[in-house]
Amino acid sequence: KKPLGKLQLLFSKAVRILGGDFRWQTLPCEFHVRIQGMNFVIFEEVPSGATYLHLSENADRDKLVSDPAFKKEFIKNMTERFRPALWNRDIGDGHVYQCPDQSIIGLSFAEIAKHRNIHVAEVFVDLLVEYGNQLIWKLVIGNERDDAINDLYADRTGSNLMSFSDAGAHIQNMANYNFPLQMLARLKNMRKNGLETISDEHAIHRLSGELADWHGIDTGYIKKGARADINVINPENLHHSLDSIVEADFDGIENFTRLVNRNDGIVNSVLINGKVAVRDDQCVETLGKSMGYGSFLRAS
């Protein structure tokens, strides 16, 4: 896995030299996803996966994956190394999270393939045929290397923004809503392991004022007369369990859950426009129900 961070920063710099104002959106934590069967957008990057996802009925999908021709095409797609893609298509990195077959929970697809002595992509299709959406697995798509992500943290050329999550569009696949806290926790751990990196002050600016400046929004700074949008956190409790994924009820939809992260013991309080919105990890009752917690932020 070759890091693309430096190449991305170079591309952004080249665009600016040519008169553009381009920034990469950077997720500053590991890109964790949880997938039911084959129901995730990364499979649209390969023809066999796109064919599967474009079928709306489960019966049609089951029929497709049971076809030997599909398995052959899927294996071919998973072994192609020169197709442009976000995902490296190493499906062996995936680990089984839930499955009717309790014996494979916690194992990677690579480990299962080794045990069965067949190609890892073939193992995946076999499990998909047998269990369908009851096969739930997890995967780290990117940002797993501290040295690579550190290049993106430390960039002072204005080539990237610490601003990408996309969890709100994939509520049953990912839960990176607390990526600012995850970034601070990762920096703490990187320093503990002897890796030279940016200061907490610089990181907080990258997560607040820098974003506001680029978007032309009058916020992101603590100063006299400014909106009092403030998070108070306990840095002693920053830890790696911030990226742990749990299921929570989705308000407004019965019997439907979404994936979230927990920040227990970290967020002391949150002020929005000077009003307390969160106290000791808990939202106050008036949040989302009464006026005054915010206003439309117009870009300049």
What is each stretch, according to the model?
Residues 1-197:
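Active-site neighborhoods of metal-dependent hydrolases
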Residues 14-17, 129, 186-193, 209, ...:
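Short, well-ordered loop/turn and helix-capping segments at boundaries between secondary-structure elements
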Residues 25, 117, 166, 203, ...:
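Divalent metal-coordination and catalytic microenvironments
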Residues 136-143, 198-202, 212-247:
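Acidic, glycine-enriched loop/beta-strand segments at the rims
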Residues 152-160, 177, 232-289:
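C-terminal cap of metal-dependent C-N hydrolases
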Residues 183-184, 203-206:
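Structured C-terminal cores of nucleic-acid metabolism proteins
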Residues 220, 268-269, 276, 296-300:
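Ligand-binding pocket scaffold of soluble enzyme catalytic domains
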Residues 285-300:
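Short, surface-exposed, low-complexity cationic segments
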